[in-house]
Amino acid sequence: MDSQRNLLLIALLFVTFMLWQAWETDKNPPATTQAIQQATNAVTGDATNQGVPASGQGKLITVKTDVLSLTINTRGGDVEQAHLLAYPDTLGSDKPFHLLETTSEFVYQAQSGLTGKNGPDNPANGPRPLFTTTQDSFELADGQNELRIPMTYTAADGVTYTKTFVLKRGDYALNVDYSVNNTSAQPLELTLFGQLKQSIDLPKHRDTGSSNFALHTYRGAAFSSSEDKYKKYSFSDMDENLNITTNSGWVAMLQQYFATAWIPTTAGANTFYTNKLGNGQAAIGFKAAPVVVAAGSQQNLNATLWVGPEIQDKMAAVAPHLDLTVDYGWLWFISQPLFKLLKFLHGFIGNWGFSIIAITFIVRGVMYPLTKAQYTSMAKMRLLQPKLQAMRERIGDDKQRMSQEMMALYKSEKVNPLGGCFPLLIQMPIFLALYYMLMGSVELRHAPFALWIHDLSAQDPYYILPILMGVTMFFIQKMSPTTVTDPMQQKIMTYMPVIFTVFFLWFPSGLVMYYIVSNLVTILQQQLIYRGLEKRGLHSREKK
């Protein structure tokens, strides 16, 4: 097998990849815009009238740290808005990324409360609790490392509920602590819950789609339990509601680069559930083990809420396996170590683009023995072509005998007919793993390289890199010996660089740059290997 046929194999692998991506997109089709209907009784007011609560609504208070800007509704104490201050909405924008949102077009909230027989959030006990606060806005001051937002509600029976949000500097994980002071004469049966609720259909301004070719990123729910470290649960899966009991884990809503998650921290078994609401919304949540607060006693209940980017090391520190929410697809076992290596290199280099170039040299250096074996195998196969042709003429149409004698010839000449394919079969998963890494790692979102490349996770706006990639592919093809004599195959090979250039027009610029550098290294390695093969009589220069 010669290098031209290797290019055909690469093309076949690419087509297979594209078909698989198309199947994934069909399985989880992007949602279309749809008007959000009236919220259910568990939903708080519309945030379009912020600061002017409608009848039955609570007051909207604002909370700001160095990394988060939140809006909390005092009716129930739900987080209705969340902006990520360190992440622009789009490249070059002054607006921070809008993660949680409550508008007439789209609802995405982090809810929590106390249900159970005596819970103030139990619909059977009336409207959700209306908390009071000492002020309408809270902000983390300079030199302050922790911000506490206490909210108090006193029920008709005299029981006092204090819901406190605790935020820390530089942290996307916030604690939600409930303190129940039962001053009544009766015990209270309570169940802590946390829920993430989101509109199933995306309005245009929330569309996370990309112009990258065949790109599909997951948007939906996920959870981790005692039995499953990480499991996606798409909106379509919620036609059959989740209902499991676990002693550990978390529930989450995911999208490209960002996530929200509830992590129960109260001891005991938790119930994880999903629910498709009748208003075009879906929810995933947890219910903690029920507790009984004796008359005249006090009880604390708590959970942790993650609202932010999918930063793997920080998420892993918050909860086991929470870092698995970074969507590296089915090649996660390659993408994860690749990203760790890339991050290590970035610590020294300081530029993600040059780090990708460095990792390309490392990968190709490690692959060099296989590459050398590939070219040696192809050279031996070329030398066997006259013997194989003579064998075909001698044996004729007896396929079984031809196959037997071919294998005997390969064995006697110590040639592996698949030796030229094996290195490619290893390189393609690495290439695809890098693709997923670029699409799933928030660190590479809007990461600049140099000159006109301002975002390595987006396509080259001027298509310069794909054209350069096609040029390098053309040179590799011209420098490679060929045994292809079929006119149709020759025509296909002639247009292969053009076809690949078109493929790469919409690929992330970081991935195209990886392929360009990989091709340049291939050219250098090719010349080095050919010189060695010439000395062994396995290769001769030929004019193309």
From Swiss-Prot:
The chain crosses the membrane at residues 6-26, 343-363, 418-438, 456-476, 497-517. Coiled coil: none annotated. Its main location: membrane. GO terms for cellular component: plasma membrane. Signal peptide: none annotated. The keyword Transferase does not apply. It is a multi-pass membrane protein. Keywords: Cell inner membrane, Cell membrane, Chaperone, Membrane, Protein transport, Transmembrane, Transmembrane helix, Transport. The keyword Ribosomal protein does not apply. Pfam families: 60KD_IMP, YidC_periplas. InterPro entries: Membr_insert_YidC, Membr_insert_YidC_N, YidC/ALB3/OXA1/COX18, YidC/Oxa/ALB_C, YidC_ALB_C, YidC_periplasmic_sf. Disulfide bonds: none annotated. It comes from the Bacteria. GO terms for molecular function: membrane insertase activity. Residues 112-132 are annotated as: Disordered. Interacts with the Sec translocase complex via SecD. Specifically interacts with transmembrane segments of nascent integral membrane proteins during membrane integration. Required for the insertion and/or proper folding and/or complex formation of integral membrane proteins into the membrane. Involved in integration of membrane proteins that insert both dependently and independently of the Sec translocase complex, as well as at least some lipoproteins. Aids folding of multispanning membrane proteins. Belongs to the OXA1/ALB3/YidC family. Type 1 subfamily. This is Membrane protein insertase YidC.
